[in-house]
Every structure is written in C-alpha cells, then in structure tokens.
C-alpha cells in the first residue's frame, strides 16, 4: 500500500509539468499548416490596424503643422511618432524593440502662408528654403509652365513667380524651381493643373524635391492660382509669402523602429515593413501600412506563433524624402538600414515584405511587385498553396500573378538593390506597369489622403494575405527563388542588331545566358520537390520527416540567397528611375540616337522631336529641351558629379552613364519647324554619342558575360 501511495504521489507531482509541456513552444511545432493559417486569419484584426493608422494620421502631436500635418524626415513629429511606435511594439509583446538611428537631412514644415490684397491663400512647401520671419513681399509674375522659354522678355528678379505644373506629363517641380532661381526669382508657387492633386481645386501637393534647397518653393491650389492670375492684367500685384521650413543638411536623424518575434533559429529572418513619415496626413501613405505591419505582429503573437526563423517588423523613417541635392532623395531610412546599420541582413533575410497604401481598392484586381526571382514563389503561393486567403468584398478579379518587376518608388527597392529578396503590394501602377491608378492623380500626397479613403475589406485582405505569405516563406524548408526568371530577363535584354553594330559579342552573350538555364531549372526543381514533400509530410503529420526536410533545406537557402545577392550586384542597373540590365542603357541610347539621325538626314526634325529626342537618357533630354543649361548642369552634377557620388543612395554604383547630347537635343527642338535645314552639327553630336555608347555597351556586355558565367557556377 505504501508503495502504491508513493507512486501516486510522484505522478501527482509530475502532472503540472506534463500540462506545461503541452502548452510549451514545442507544442506549437506540431500545429499543422492549416491550423496555423486558420489561427492567424482569425486573429488578424483589421480594426486594430485601422486604429494605429487613424492615430498616426490624426494625432496632432505626431504632426508638425496643425492645419496640414506633415511628418518629415528627422523632424520633431517623426521623432514623436517613432517613440509612439516603439512603445506600441513593446505593448503588444514584440522583443528586441529598438529605434535604430540613421543619418538624414532634416526637414520640418512648421507653416507657410501667402497673402495677396488681404486674402490669405493656403500653401504647402517642399524641402526647400525658408523666408525671413517677416516674409517676402514682392510683385507676382505668372510664367506659364516655368520653362526657360516662358521667361523670354519677362523680368522676374526679386519677384514671386507663379507657374502651372503637371508633374506626371511634364516634369518634377525641381526644374521650374531651378529655372526660377536661375532667372533671379525670389520664390516660386506651383499650381498642379494636372498629374497630381486633381481631387479638388484647393488641393495642395508635396513631393520629394530631387534637388538643392534652392529658393522658397510652395504648392498652391488651382483655384487660388486662378484668382491671383485674374488680378495680374490690371497692374502690379504684390504678395507676401511667409515660409517657416527647417531644412538642415547633414544634421538630421531618422529612426527605423524594429521589433521581432524570435524564431527557433536566428540564422535567417523575414522582414515586414512600411514607413511612418508622411506628406500631409498620409493616412493611406503610409499610416495604413504601419497599422498592417503591427496588426500582423499582434496576430502572430496572439496565437503563440513560434516561427522557424526570426520575424522582424521594421517601420522606416525618411521614405518620402531624406537627403538634399540628389536625384535619389527618397527611401533614405531604408537605404541606411540595409547598407549602413544592418548590412549583415543581406544573405540573412529570406524576404522583405513591404507595404504601401494597403487599405485602398485601386482596381478590380491586385498584384504584388517583386524581384523577378520571386515571381514563381508568388504565383505558387497564390494559385497552388491550399491555405492562401482569397479577397472578400474587394478585388473581384483576384490577385494577378503574371509577375511584376518591383520599381524604385518604395523602400523595398533599396533592399532589393542591396541583395534582399523583396516585395511590395501592388499600390502604384496598373497591370500594364505604365499607367498609375487614379488614386495617384487625385489623392496622392495631398491633404485629402485622410481616413475617409479607408476600405476595411482591402485592409483585412492584405493583412491576411501577406501575413499568410510571411508564414508560408517561414514554414517552407527551402526558399523558392527562381533564377529561370533571371535567365528570361537577361535573354530579353539582348538586341542582336545593336550588339552587331557595336561590336559586342552577341553569340557569346546568348550562349552564356543559355548556359544559365539548365542549372537554374535544376535548382528550381530541387526546391519545388523539397517543398512539395514537406507539404505532404505536414498533411501526414510526419514530424520526423518535416524536421529532416528542414535540415535539408538550409544549404539550399544559403545557396539561393548568395546567388540572389550576386545577381543584384552585377546584373542590376538603373536608368534614371527604371531598373534595367546595365547594357540596356547604352543599347537603348544607340537606337534612339540612330532614329534621330535618320530623321535629320531626311530633313524631318519635327518627327525627331515628336518621337525620339526627349526620350534619350530615359527622359532627361526633355529637361534639356525646356530648361536652361545652368539648370541641367545642376542635374548632371547631382547624378554624375565627382563630389556627389556618396549621395546617391539606391542609385549608388548602378546609375547609368548619361549620353552627352544635351546641346543637340536643345538645338533640334528649337529648330523643329525648319524645312530643309542643315543639321550636320547636330548629327555629328549624335554620331559621337553613338560611338561612345558603343564602347559602354561592349564594356557592359563583357562584365555581364563574365558575371553570368560565375552565376551559373553558383547555381550548380
């Protein structure tokens, strides 16, 4: 009897530990993929996401100006928001919460006004100069679109110029601003007559400036501009412009706010992010993204999710603007994060899932932009994985998966260029990847980006869909990067005729590219097979097999991350803002210059101007056509000046080399109506440019051919 009681007593003592074992993290390893996804979808709370976004967009303590908002890089409001977000991360239970300090230029919009004949008109600034406290009182002069031709016969020295601008069809505010400064104006006000801010005639707009601080530069509503212009024919009209705008070069600090859910292993990680700096109130752009990221974190924590890898949640500062005197002045916080603060994240990060404006229904469908190597992953996750959420109450045509190349307009590109596989929800371009969604013409970067634009069904879907994508990437034993997409990209970049004209070895290039396909296909097959077997083991509840497959997948993960980093280092170029294979820049320029020459030889400058001249150097020759050489000198120095090469951010080492055709572009445009003119001088400029571009093409192709050969070995 004593022995029986002793055994019973020992069993009773052991019972609590047995119960704890069932509730321990080890228990979560036995949760099936279906139950994991079901639990996350149930816990994903779009209303929590909305509450975060709403506070960020409406709390005046988190904005620099009580009337129009604004939370610019390095500003007091951005710092206050960083504190709030770090506190919220701690409150919901994330670990290792940190405000990672990064360098930026500081911009803080405190306020501005423009008064004409006793009427005060609202204005909003760019990251440009302030006025003295008492303001600038000066005559107002209307100069059309603000090109150098609009100033002919007009004296604007010391005056305030008023221009119309369409920053989509024509040019960025930078160029009329620099032209106004060059012409001696004291300040410039721009009315958005097209392109942006079309939601209302009192809409104001702000953008990154892609230039120096220059002169005071403000957006003014179209209605206000019309009222002021109506007074000008009746005599001199004085205006008083007051701008309280802090722009401090090299003196700013932005914070990237991070927290994490620690995985069973910290060798690799998955990153979810958005940015919290804003123009105006920025509810969609990008307060909603911050809400989504924190809601995903909270849902994972609430279900006790123990990932295989670390899940890092990173809210970036200084996305909208972060540096003066550079073409690449946006996504500065993210660039600093991956290149300066955490370069070790390259080769460690399985994916960066970035978010922009995730609570607005842009179209009847949605997409994901990504690195080409991720097209297959996204397609399989969306169309073949059994646990992927489907849109409900939004996007009736579903998620399109044809593959959409990530662009330069969001933080994910900084990570992508550094070598991190990256995505962003389809927020900007329509499926043709050429035209923007109407939201960008109407609401984007205006005071009308408010909670009134919120769509809960879209937020709920994006939260569930991308949260499930993060779980999918975490749970699969092998990272599904597909280098057959890189093969296709490289193959499609070949123009055999231009290669032949340039003396580049098209046959060798084609041969090396074709040699890339078999190892890329074989690697893809290995990854797909491993992941398929893992899914089968999960369905069968075979934990031992799942563990074995995970171990087998680790070397494959290291291999594909190494190859991905290599691809971006040697095979990614940038033509102004457009991702390319490096040789495509000279290849394209040669073709365009030859078309122009053909037109000029047959005395047809009008066709040359209408179809070709402005498109050389991506679009930069359109600026050469319309703005003074001094303005273009500033543009050239920002991009290619020897003293500014450490100020290029995501354009560092991948920006294209411009063809020197500026004088010819301007001359052909100015002579476009001539019939039978002699264009020998201009033809010579374009021919010299072709000769130089042929040299660049041969050099690029040589480097690429060598790099592709090494890539083939990395994949084998």
Across the structure, where does each feature detected by a protein language model lie?
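Second-shell loop/turn segments in exported
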Residues: 36-44, 62-76, 142, 164-177, ...
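Active-site-adjacent substrate-binding region
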Residues: 252, 358-488
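Extracellular/luminal Protease-associated
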Residues: 75, 124-216, 401
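Noncatalytic luminal/extracellular "stalk/propeptide" segments of secretory-pathway proteins
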Residues: 47, 54, 58-160
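Bacterial Sec-dependent signal peptides at the C-terminal "C-region" and cleavage site
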Residues: 15-25
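C-terminal non-catalytic alpha-helical accessory regions
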Residues: 464-465, 473-716
């Amino acid at each position: 009897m004593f022995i029986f009681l002793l055994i019973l007593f020992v069993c009773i003592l052991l019972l609590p530990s047995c119960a704890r074992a069932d509730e321990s993290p080890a228990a979560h390893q036995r949760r099936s993929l279906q139950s994991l996804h079901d639990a996350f979808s149930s816990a994903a709370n779009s209303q929590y996401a909305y509450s975060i976004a709403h506070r960020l967009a409406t709390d005046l303590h988190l904005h620099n100006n009580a009337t129009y908002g604004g939370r610019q890089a390095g500003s007091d409001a951005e710092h206050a928001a960083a504190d709030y977000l770090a506190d919220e991360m701690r409150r919901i239970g994330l670990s290792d919460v940190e405000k990672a300090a990064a360098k930026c230029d500081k911009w803080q919009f405190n306020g501005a006004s423009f008064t004409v004949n006793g009427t005060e008109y609202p204005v909003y600034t760019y990251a440009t100069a302030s006025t003295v406290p008492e303001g600038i009182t000066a005559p107002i002069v209307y100069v059309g679109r603000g090109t150098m031709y609009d100033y002919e016969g007009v004296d604007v020295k010391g005056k305030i110029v008023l221009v119309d601008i369409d920053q989509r069809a024509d040019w960025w505010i930078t160029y009329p601003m620099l032209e106004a400064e060059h012409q001696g104006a004291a300040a410039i006000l721009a009315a958005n007559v097209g392109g942006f801010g079309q939601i209302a005639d009192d809409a104001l707009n702000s953008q990154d400036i892609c230039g120096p601080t220059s002169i005071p530069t403000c957006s003014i509503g179209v209605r206000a501009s019309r009222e002021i212009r109506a007074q000008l024919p009746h005599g001199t009209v004085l205006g008083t412009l007051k701008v309280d705008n802090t722009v401090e070069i090299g003196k700013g600090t932005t914070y990237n706010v991070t927290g994490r859910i620690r995985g069973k292993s910290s060798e690799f990680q998955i990153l979810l992010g958005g940015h919290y700096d804003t123009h105006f109130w920025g509810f969609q752009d990008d307060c909603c993204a911050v809400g989504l990221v924190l809601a995903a974190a909270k849902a994972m924590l609430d279900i006790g999710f123990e990932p295989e890898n670390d899940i890092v949640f990173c809210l970036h500062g200084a996305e909208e603007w972060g540096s003066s005197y550079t073409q690449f002045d946006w996504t500065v916080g993210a660039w600093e994060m991956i290149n300066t603060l955490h370069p070790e994240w390259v080769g460690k990060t399985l994916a960066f899932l970035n978010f922009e404006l995730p609570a607005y229904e842009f179209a009847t469908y949605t997409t994901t932009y990504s690195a080409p190597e991720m097209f297959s992953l996204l397609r399989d996750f969306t169309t073949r994985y059994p646990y992927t959420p489907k849109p409900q109450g939004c996007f009736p045509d579903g998620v399109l998966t044809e593959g959409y190349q990530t662009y330069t307009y969001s933080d994910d590109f900084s990570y992508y260029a550094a070598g991190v596989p990256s995505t962003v929800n389809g927020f900007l371009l329509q499926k043709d990847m050429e035209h923007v969604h109407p939201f960008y013409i109407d609401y984007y970067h205006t005071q009308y980006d408010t909670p009134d634009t919120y769509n809960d069904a879209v937020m709920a879907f994006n939260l569930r869909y991308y949260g499930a994508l993060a779980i999918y990437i975490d749970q699969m034993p092998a990272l599904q990067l597909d280098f057959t997409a890189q093969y296709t990209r490289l193959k499609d970049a070949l123009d055999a005729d231009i290669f032949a004209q340039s003396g580049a070895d098209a046959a060798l290039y084609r041969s090396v590219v074709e040699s890339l396909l078999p190892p890329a296909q074989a690697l893809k097959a290995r990854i797909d097979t491993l992941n398929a077997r893992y899914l089968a083991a999960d369905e069968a509840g075979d934990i031992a097999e799942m563990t074995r497959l995970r171990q087998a997948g680790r070397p494959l993960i290291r291999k594909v991350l190494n190859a991905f980093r290599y691809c971006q280092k040697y095979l990614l170029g940038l033509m102004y803002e457009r991702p390319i294979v490096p040789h495509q820049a000279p290849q394209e320029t040669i073709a365009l210059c030859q078309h122009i020459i053909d037109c000029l030889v047959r005395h047809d400058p009008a066709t040359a101007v209408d179809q070709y001249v402005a498109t050389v150097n991506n679009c930069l020759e359109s600026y050469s056509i319309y703005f003074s050489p001094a303005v273009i000198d500033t543009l050239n120095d920002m991009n290619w000046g020897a003293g500014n090469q450490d100020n290029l951010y995501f354009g560092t080492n991948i920006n294209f080399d411009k063809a020197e055709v500026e004088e010819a572009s301007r001359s052909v445009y100015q002579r476009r109506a001539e019939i039978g003119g002699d264009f020998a001088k201009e033809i010579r400029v374009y021919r010299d440019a072709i000769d130089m571009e042929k040299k660049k093409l041969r050099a690029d192709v040589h480097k690429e051919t060598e790099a592709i050969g090494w890539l083939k070995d990395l994949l084998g």
